[in-house]
Design a protein with these regions (language model features):
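Short, conserved clusters of charged catalytic residues that mark active-site
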Residues: 9, 63, 77, 134-135
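Residue-level signal for well-ordered alpha-helical positions
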Residues: 5, 41, 71, 126-129
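Small-residue-enriched segments and motifs
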Residues: 12, 66, 80, 137-140
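Non-catalytic connector elements of ABC transporters
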Residues: 75, 85-167
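ABC ATPase nucleotide-binding domains
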Residues: 1-67
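ABC transporter nucleotide-binding domain
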Residues: 55-89
Length: 167
């Protein structure tokens, strides 16, 4: 196996070669980071069916369902029920208590059961500005990773809520 820096360097080199020769390349991998780095389009399969075919940024930022959201990248998830949909937002009453305002990705109606996904890099500890979702949690663990720290919180009944905080 290649070390991390060499592996990333080789991924960029292979991507540039693909772009320069101008041919279609099908690359099969289970490494989501590698797929996001090297691809212009990605297909996510589940049980032999394509769940989403998109550009890397659209796949990561706008997954069409919870399977894709949980498959690509890291997520904190909360189960709940939609209590309101309006103005391009939905309110979800969480099964563990509390409420989250979110984008209605694949929900259609009030009363519908759903999952809310939040990427670790999207949450902020002690935000200064007013935000739709502001909740108290308890820091359980901080792990230093060089360019960021992983912070594990107990938040809204989720004891494994992860934040990525830049150093």
């Amino acid at each position: 196996a290649l070390d991390k820096n060499l592996r990333e360097s080789m991924q960029y080199e292979i991507k540039h070669i693909h772009e320069s020769i101008g041919v279609t390349v099908v690359y099969v991998t289970h490494d989501q980071s590698e797929a996001l780095t090297m691809s212009s389009r990605i297909a996510v399969f589940n049980d032999g069916k394509v769940q989403q075919l998109s550009t890397p940024d659209k796949l990561y930022e706008e997954p069409v369902n919870s399977f894709v959201a949980e498959f690509i990248g890291e997520n904190n998830t909360f189960a709940g029920e939609v209590t309101d949909i309006s103005g391009g937002k939905c309110k979800v009453k969480l099964d563990t208590g509390g409420e989250i305002i979110s984008n209605p990705i694949s929900v259609k109606s009030k009363g519908e059961k759903t999952k809310v996904s939040l990427r670790p890099e999207r949450a902020i500890i002690d935000p200064e500005e007013k935000m739709d979702n502001k909740h108290k949690g308890k820091i359980e663990e901080i792990i230093y990773h060089g360019d960021h720290a992983r912070v594990r919180l107990n938040l809204l009944g989720n004891k494994e809520f992860i934040l990525k905080v830049p150093n």
